A protein has these predicted regions:
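Structural beta-strand/beta-sheet cores of well-ordered domains, especially the beta-sheet scaffolds
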Residues: 6, 43-44, 77-79, 152-154, ...
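Glycine-rich phosphate/pyrophosphate-binding beta-alpha loops
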Residues: 32-40, 60-66, 161-165, 193-210
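A glycine-rich dinucleotide-binding beta-alpha-beta segment and adjacent secondary-structure elements
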Residues: 118-197
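An anion/pyrophosphate-binding glycine-rich loop and adjacent beta-alpha core
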Residues: 14-16, 20-118
Length: 215
């Protein structure tokens, strides 16, 4: 198993195989995955870093990619900025995630410890893209270009969490191998505990189909 926050995901499979002499692969790797933030809001909003610079299209294909984008930002600080129209469209389920609300963008910036003028300029530029239906910075799908213009305005701090990777080296028949490439008799592995090739930006499918095949 790989630790993605579930209390039962403690690496028991990896530890057991290591005790039996398995060759463990990728144990120093980790994935930055976005912590639980409502995607209905984040994809329609604007994301900025600590300098109030927008840093991507807000429409990442997978939370691991979204988390990695946050990890690349200065001090790993990122904010999701949106207005009350976007909040209302997402429903009440979004409200618990909102950390800052203000009647103006400048006041919202102060609450988030951001530069008020810089954030106001960033929002104005983004709203221009929304009006034209063309994102000149990151080519965001026009379907998700929603202007940020109706007060109150809201912000969610975007955070990533670590998901540990690594697993046993196996052969095509799912035998677990030792560091010399020899089969450890009677020991098999499939699924995430044998998923040594999953890393920060490489997503192989976690091997769950192999686990079903072995079963």
């Amino acid at each position: 198993n790989s630790s993605a926050g579930h209390p039962s995901a403690m690496g028991d499979g990896q530890r057991m195989m290591a005790r039996h002499g398995a060759d463990m692969v990728g144990m120093g790797e980790a994935t930055h995955t976005l912590s639980k933030i409502p995607q209905e809001t984040t994809i329609r909003s604007m994301h900025v870093n600590a300098a109030c610079n927008r840093y991507w299209s807000e429409q990442g294909w997978h939370n691991d990619h979204r988390g990695s984008m946050i990890h690349k930002q200065p001090m790993q600080i990122a904010w999701c900025i949106f207005d009350d129209n976007i909040r209302a469209a997402a429903g009440d389920a979004e409200d618990d995630a909102i950390q800052c609300t203000a009647d103006t963008i400048e006041k919202l910036a102060e609450m988030c410890a951001l530069d008020p003028r810089a954030l106001a300029d960033a929002v104005a530029r983004y709203n221009g893209y929304c009006a034209e239906g063309v994102d000149l910075e990151y080519a965001k799908d026009p379907e998700f270009l929603i202007p940020i213009e109706k007060a109150p305005f809201h912000a969610i701090r975007l955070r990533y969490v670590w998901m540990s990777n690594g697993g046993a080296h196996i052969d095509p028949e799912a035998h677990v191998l030792d560091p010399d490439g020899n089969v450890i008799e009677g020991l098999f592995a499939a699924g995430a505990c044998a998923n040594g090739h999953k890393s920060n930006m490489f997503y192989p499918g976690t091997g769950l189909d192999m686990a079903l095949g072995v079963l």
